[in-house]
Amino acid sequence: MDYGKTLNLPETEFPMRAGLPQREPEFLKFWQENDIYNKKHELHEGHPKFVLHDGPPYANGKIHMGHALNKILKDIIMKYKYAQGFDTPYVPGWDTHGMPIEHACIKEMGLNRNELDVLTLRGKCHDFALKWIDIQRDDFKRLGVLGDWDHPYVTLHHDFEAEQIRVFGTMANKGYIYKGKKTVYWCPHCETALAEAEIEYGEQKTPTIFVKMPLVKDNGMTPETAKGKKAYMVIWTTTPWTMPANVAVALNPNLEYAWVECEGEVLFLAKDLLETVGQKCHKDLSNILGTTMGKDMEFAECVHPFPEYNNRRSLVVMADYVTLEAGTGCVHTAPGHGDVDFETGLKYKLPILCPVDAQGKLTAEAGERFQGMFVFDANIPVLKYLAELNCLLGKENIKHQYAHCWRCKNPIIFRATSQWFASVDGFRDDALKAIANDVQWIPAWGEQRIHNMVSERHDWCISRQRVWGVPIPVFYCEHCGEHLINEETIESVAQWFEKEGSDAWWAHTAEELLPAGTVCPKCGHNHFRKESDIMDVWFDSGSTHMAVAAKRPELGWPVSMYLEGSDQHRGWFQSSLLTSVAVTGKAPYKSVLTHGYVVDGEGRKMSKSVGNVIVPQDIIKQYGADIVRLWTASSDYKADIRISPKIIKQLSEVYRKIRNTIRYILGNTNDFNYETDAVPFNEMLELDQWALMHLQLLKKEVTAAYESYDFHVLYHAIHNFCTVEMSSFYLDIIKDRLYAYKADSKERRSAQTAMHEILMDLVVMLSPVLSFTMEEVWQFMKKPANAPQSVQMLPWPAVKEEYINEELETKWDNFIEIRSEITKVLELARRDKKIGHSLDAKVELHAEGEALAILQSVEKDLATLLIVSQAVVVEGAAAGAEATGREDLKVTVQAAEGHKCERCWIYSDEVGNDPEHPTLCPRCAAAIK
């Protein structure tokens, strides 16, 4: 007789090989065809809401690993919150205006932007953005992200643009919007102003110069020994091209400055920097004639070294930002080309010179010598001219971090221009209060970071000199130049945009856009022109909380969470906070979670030139999206997140182990009906009770990790549970019970009850992470008739506190530790060919003290627990026994006694007792009758 056929072997059609790249699209189709997203919403309608407001990615390219990480983190949270009973509407969005799209379309059309019809270019940009939205949407859906993909919010939609106009109008009516001349970040390549959030820093080699500024008014501070000699203040600058705009020299009032004789001249600079400057300029600056405090030189005067400027004076001013960290302690000041310079210029009523045009070329104001030169190309000519004039003390090249445009990657400049601003000072205090009192920051350091940024930031430059965006809704009187913006004009423009979108601004005249009968409040005339600038795209995305969350009925304001990369403290988190506080006085979000950047396996930034770029599409093609999701959950996103082929391969192995654990349980519960076959907990075998107790402990740990958004903690907890506690211990031990006991025996049903509960809870706990695989498992599981259609609809499993027993936990934890020592000795015996399988062994356990007590507590089941044929506990030590890692335990391994049962392979003296089955042990003989 073939006794193998009488065993209760696992049966399941759940595939061993995942085949995720091929199988996952089937589940995407299942979710879509069965409208799972909307069915989930209907099931939880009326429940408390958890609204995670999607930060809009930019619609201009394939998604990268950072996008994948971000969207999957959001999806994990939303799926968990749904299981916890929340209504979790998720509306994805896209950012669609701005320079990159405009640049791409101009390049595609092969024309100069000034040659293009505005509406033609805008139409091209519109189509470009929609094309990339479709591509990105498919990529995001392929990651398993569930959301309202058919009704996303898009910043170019008419209703969105209209609400953005209303947000701007509310801020303007509160007095928070103004036009003024200020130094702003300016990209000569893009020919537009930039916001602070649009700046990134990269290393750049720059010529720095030490310039002698002739001193013509010394406040009577020149030492007697210096009189009769030419005196110069020595300034230092890293931007020689800004010398034509110099109008002042800034000193620190509390620093000590020295008058130094050098080559027949007198130089004035910070005393503590004499040695450093002397070395850099190859000059002997040791002959100090006297010293003066900085404050005593206020309102002294130098003369600009360029003679064509007709002895233009440079005022000596005081500034606390002057330090001894670099330079000379005398700071070149050009208010038209620096933010702190500009503030100093206002304080001292200095002229704001900015002899640079929109393309970054020096104008006639800089002088005929430099006119038409690109700013950075002028550095060397300025340096040479100063040398000709005997005003160059020294020069050096330095490498330093310099600001670049994050769109075109070119270096930017500071340029004083007339721009529209949001007056952050008007609501800064309210914003800081909201940061401290209204928002949970995750990680906690995010609070201090954004607090510092908001407290130190300048007013927000919100105008851009482009056409692909939402226009600044301001009109100018053709007669007197007065600008016009009020509630009526804003509402009129908003209504036009609701009908036609922001194209209406260029398609209609000012008179058509304005309410009938509008006249200038200053002069009474009725002819107007429209503002030509558009809004900063950060104003677009910064308005989403009002234009989307506050408007869509399924959402709500303020939202529960914003979740983006840590760079958004100066980007979207901040722009949203500023518009929200300005309009409502409150933060738009209750919590903000930030993650780091994705880097390669060595912690380096991904770069095509380095060749270390990994894209999600390639991982999905080879391994499947669930591996990308597992990578996301396994990473501590608070720091930078590493990825490499090796890391992905390791995660695929972890996935395989988890899948195999689940497949084993599916196969061994195939003939089990929980409703009719389940064994009550108090009647279960103690080992099964232990397994369910550990399941409760796992649920506690996993729930806490989900609640604190520490997904890497739950990843490690579940991985350890599946591979160590289940596969290596519990499931290994109960295999004999599952296979060899009678199919409907209490012993077997007890184990199946435990496995069923473990599987049910594991599926729910893993479904936010391994969404595709858990959906697949759910379709294979035996379920009651009223079970939800999708795993995504299952409620979160409650912790059964009554299963938790500290005494039981201690007992089994102690045994597991001892078992590992015994298993090591068995492995040695197998290696030495004393035994083959562990069932070929009989073990004698020579124990004392604690080890003896632990072993005696499970003595009747000891052979089963050790997966050997016989186990004997002997009190006391024994000569020749194998030592273990414990002093109170030694082990002897010998061949098992008796004969091997043909069915269960356990050796026993009782094999053959049943004459009908002479090769079976009594248990197996009874099991097949």
Segments (PLM) and residue ranges:
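Acidic, turn-prone loop/beta-hairpin segments
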Residues: D95, V184, P188, L194-G202, ...
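NTP-handling and nucleic-acid-processing catalytic cores
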Residues: Q22-L28, L146, H158-Q359, A431-S463, ...
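Alpha-helical recognition segments enriched in aromatics with Gly/Pro capping
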Residues: K217, E308, Y348-G360, R466-W468, ...
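Core structural elements
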Residues: F140, E163, R407, W460, ...
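N-terminal, positively charged nucleic-acid-binding surface of large information/translation enzymes
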Residues: M1-G264, A334-A366, C391-A431, M453-V454, ...
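Conserved phosphate-binding loops in nucleotide/dinucleotide-binding enzymes
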Residues: N112, G202, T333-G336, F376, ...
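Short cysteine-rich clusters marking metal-coordination/redox-active sites
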Residues: C187, C405, C477, C520-C523, ...
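Catalytic adenosine-cofactor/nucleotide-binding cores of aminoacyl-tRNA synthetases and other
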Residues: H404-C408, Y597-E602, M606-M684, K783-A787, ...
